[in-house]
Curated annotation (Swiss-Prot):
One of its GO terms (biological process) is phosphorelay signal transduction system. Residues 18-142 form the Response regulatory domain. Induction: Transcriptionally regulated by FilR1. Signal peptide: none annotated. It comes from Methanothrix harundinacea (strain 6Ac). It comes from the Archaea. Member of the two-component regulatory system FilI/FilRs, which is involved in the regulation of methanogenesis. Phosphorylated by FilI. InterPro entries: CheY-like_superfamily (IPR011006), Sig_transdc_resp-reg_receiver (IPR001789), TCS_response_regulator (IPR052893). This is Probable methanogenesis regulatory protein FilR2. The modification 4-aspartylphosphate is found at residue 75. It holds the Pfam family Response_reg. Keywords: Phosphoprotein, Transcription, Transcription regulation, Two-component regulatory system.
């Protein structure tokens, strides 16, 4: 597996399970990807640093012919287009709305929480401060969303 620091970097493996990670903080993104790797995730993580890049990526893949992500990990405080707008556009799209979106943010604001759920977020989690706590959070995300949860996937 390889790590990079540029928008559009990919953590690749053979399993077709794709997670779209939308995170502008390099350190947070690296820790999240490292936690998935240490937990034995064998899919692919596609990391984008801003909301516009995420929407462009999803629009490109939405048309068919390319694999859509099976889960989106979304920060709210993003450059260019904020996470709330990314979430709103995902959930308004007939083809994308079934993709689980997990907000992973530092925001503890009740307004952000209410707004995310009004836009049909699947889960809202606060980023832990330590790597060990983040690793536990990622482990729980992986166990629930990639293990127990069943979803129909994109339309």
């Amino acid at each position: 597996m390889s790590y990079g620091l540029d928008s559009g970097d990919v953590l690749e493996a053979e399993d077709p399970f794709i997670i779209l990670l939308v995170e502008d903080n390099n350190a947070h993104a690296m820790l999240i990807m490292r936690a998935f790797e240490r937990l034995g995730f064998t899919g692919r993580i596609e990391w984008l640093r801003d909301g516009k890049a995420a929407l462009d990526y999803l629009r490109l893949h939405e048309g068919g012919g390319r694999s859509l992500p099976r889960m989106v990990l979304l920060d709210l405080r993003l450059p260019k287009v904020d996470g709330h707008e990314v979430l709103s556009q995902i959930k308004r799209s007939e083809r994308l709305r079934a993709i689980p979106v997990v907000v992973l943010t530092t925001s503890t604001s009740d307004d952000d929480l209410r707004r995310a759920y009004s836009n049909h977020v699947n889960s809202y989690l606060i980023k832990p401060l330590s790597f060990e706590d983040l690793k536990r959070t990622v482990e729980e995300i992986k166990e629930y969303w990639l293990g127990w949860n069943r979803s129909p996937g994109p339309a």
